[in-house]
Amino acid sequence: MVEKRVQPLARDAMAYVLAGGRGSRLKELTDRRAKPAVYFGGKARIIDFALSNALNSGIRRIGVATQYKAHSLIRHMQRGWNFFRPERNESFDILPASQRVSETQWYEGTADAVYQNIDIIQDYGVEYMVILAGDHVYKMDYEWMLQQHVDSGADVTIGCLEVPRMEAVGFGVMHVNDKDEIIAFVEKPADPPPIPDKPDFALASMGIYVFHTKFLLDALRRDAADPNSSRDFGKDIIPYIVKNGKAVAHRFAKSCVRSDFEHEPYWRDVGTIDAYWQANIDLTAIVPELDIYDKSWPIWTYAEITPPAKFVHDDEDRRGSATSSVVSGDCIISGAMLNNSLLFTGVRANSFSKMEGAVILPNVKIGRRAQLKNVVIDHGVVIPEGLVVGEDAELDAKRFRRTESGICLITQPMIDKLDI
């Protein structure tokens, strides 16, 4: 007798990705695009991680709420995420703010971005909702979180991880009992409460929530009727449930997808220039903590058909070379030297130029004899011949967006203002 296979919970779930934020701490990098649309890892966009996690977890209904400067993001998803088939009970919906509930307002907060599309959610009739932030870099199997949600009988299950206490000021922070039931929750506290047995760490929300659909829709309607609400999950919905219902914490270590279990679970907010630079540079390690080469859990994305990368010239002072670097397709390293750098598609690096600790977005052109250290260079920038960045901190700060740790963000308008 063949045992009947139980359908994974993910097949009766919808992933709802919140992708409307600007990400203002990324400064000029989000002047033309929303944070989820920012390039990452040589080939992908940040949003591809949440979407790939959902797909790889078995979720086949996905909605993405967009708002701020969404053209680049929408175009990317239309090109790279158009393979869902309704005849297989699959769907992929892009949901710009469109005043579906109110004719006068855009999305007012994260909860409102779900509430305004409540009719679409009801039409699909799924049992569970997985609410995701579209601007984090990590690999996670949501099926484990769904299973914990069902087993615990929770009203909401919240993904969480341990972070250094002083870094927790930008997150929702929770206090749990020995059953991982949340007994207190505060959004972005100035003085984050520590984990009882780990005074230097706090338990931070990942912005991942699992609900039974009916419970979520009732909670959203109640919140929408409250004139004092800010329409936000972290500020309104979650604290209400913690106080009046049952909220359970799901620890990221239980569902993190990693190739090497000696590595710590990898999750990055990449919300600042420093964090964005570091997360990209992390990928140049011999064995990176975030494995983008894992074929069992691929990061799906839109990929142009491009020729291979090419390295040319082999003279003593003019040798195309790269060490400890990631170089994407259609790059030509023509007598240039790379070290500990990550190049996206279509970069041209010309003779005698040197790059170290460089994160270079697509279609950048590096002029001859340029010297670039610890930089993030935006899409399509043309670096003039002989430009030096990373040696004179004072000059760099006048010309570019330089962080306190010395990372320089370079955009084309900044280059256009140079007197060289």
UniProtKB/Swiss-Prot annotation:
It comes from Rhizobium johnstonii (strain DSM 114642 / LMG 32736 / 3841). Its EC number is 2.7.7.27. Involved in the biosynthesis of ADP-glucose, a building block required for the elongation reactions to produce glycogen. Catalyzes the reaction between ATP and alpha-D-glucose 1-phosphate (G1P) to produce pyrophosphate and ADP-Glc. This is Glucose-1-phosphate adenylyltransferase. The gene is glgC. Pathway: Glycan biosynthesis; glycogen biosynthesis. The keyword Cell cycle does not apply. Alpha-D-glucose 1-phosphate binds at Y107, G172, E187, K188, S205. It catalyses: alpha-D-glucose 1-phosphate + ATP + H(+) = ADP-alpha-D-glucose + diphosphate.
